[in-house]
From Swiss-Prot:
<keyword id="KW-0378">Hydrolase</keyword>
<keyword id="KW-1188">Viral release from host cell</keyword>
<keyword id="KW-0081">Bacteriolytic enzyme</keyword>
<comment type="function">
    <text>Endolysin with lysozyme activity that degrades host peptidoglycans and participates with the holin and spanin proteins in the sequential events which lead to the programmed host cell lysis releasing the mature viral particles. Once the holin has permeabilized the host cell membrane, the endolysin can reach the periplasm and break down the peptidoglycan layer.</text>
</comment>
<dbReference type="InterPro" id="IPR018392">
    <property type="entry name" value="LysM_dom"/>
</dbReference>
<dbReference type="Pfam" id="PF00959">
    <property type="entry name" value="Phage_lysozyme"/>
</dbReference>
<keyword id="KW-0326">Glycosidase</keyword>
<dbReference type="InterPro" id="IPR034690">
    <property type="entry name" value="Endolysin_T4_type"/>
</dbReference>
<dbReference type="Pfam" id="PF01476">
    <property type="entry name" value="LysM"/>
</dbReference>
<keyword id="KW-0204">Cytolysis</keyword>
<dbReference type="InterPro" id="IPR051018">
    <property type="entry name" value="Bacteriophage_GH24"/>
</dbReference>
<keyword id="KW-0929">Antimicrobial</keyword>
<dbReference type="GO" id="GO:0044659">
    <property type="term" value="P:viral release from host cell by cytolysis"/>
</dbReference>
<dbReference type="InterPro" id="IPR023346">
    <property type="entry name" value="Lysozyme-like_dom_sf"/>
</dbReference>
<keyword id="KW-1035">Host cytoplasm</keyword>
<dbReference type="GO" id="GO:0009253">
    <property type="term" value="P:peptidoglycan catabolic process"/>
</dbReference>
<dbReference type="GO" id="GO:0016998">
    <property type="term" value="P:cell wall macromolecule catabolic process"/>
</dbReference>
Amino acid sequence: MQISQAGINLIKSFEGLQLKAYKAVPTEKHYTIGYGHYGSDVSPRQVITAKQAEDMLRDDVQAFVDGVNKALKVSVTQNQFDALVSFAYNVGLGAFRSSSLLEYLNEGRTALAAAEFPKWNKSGGKVYQGLINRRAQEQALFNSGTPKNVSRGTSSTKTTPKYKVKSGDNLTKIAKKHNTTVATLLKLNPSIKDPNMIRVGQTINVTGSGGKTHKVKSGDTLSKIAVDNKTTVSRLMSLNPEITNPNHIKVGQTIRLS
């Protein structure tokens, strides 16, 4: 499963947005920007847009999406999944994996799992109102209904292909390896400002030329194409970063489906 826009919005509401690079503590090695993105890829005077900040957040959250997917042994709803990713993003994957919340959930004791959220209200042994508020919203989302359950391993939504940068890699080499272009990789990875500055171990969104495509016909909309191909609009937009407005596609345009 993938986190939905509602899940991203929940995390955004707690993280706070900074469009200019800053150091929360002067002694920190690297700068922070966006929704808490921290690392060597943030330059001292860097300024980004809100869209770029969300893209960075999605990149950062992906590891937690993958971690939650691996830890779950039961079917969950989209809202439950979003709440779990937000929770894991805040407490860490290690704490999530060893939590009673996950244990109860995997045992099918959903009500007991939901009751665990409020217990995670401390940092350094001290209770914080911000954590009380966050847990309450995650719990409410977890308990809220969705149209139907999504079975483990049967969701039609697929993750965007990923590639982990190895020693000796550059963006041109990675593009050739995946039958794509540097320009496409930059669109898929808006957090990369300089194609010559990627680091070993960095995870990059990639795409290949062998996937299924659809040529837009008269009367097509992105929603119709998504339904016809058993996918989602958000998935299509992630596969086609050149589409910035789902209402603006043109006849003859080729859209990647996988």
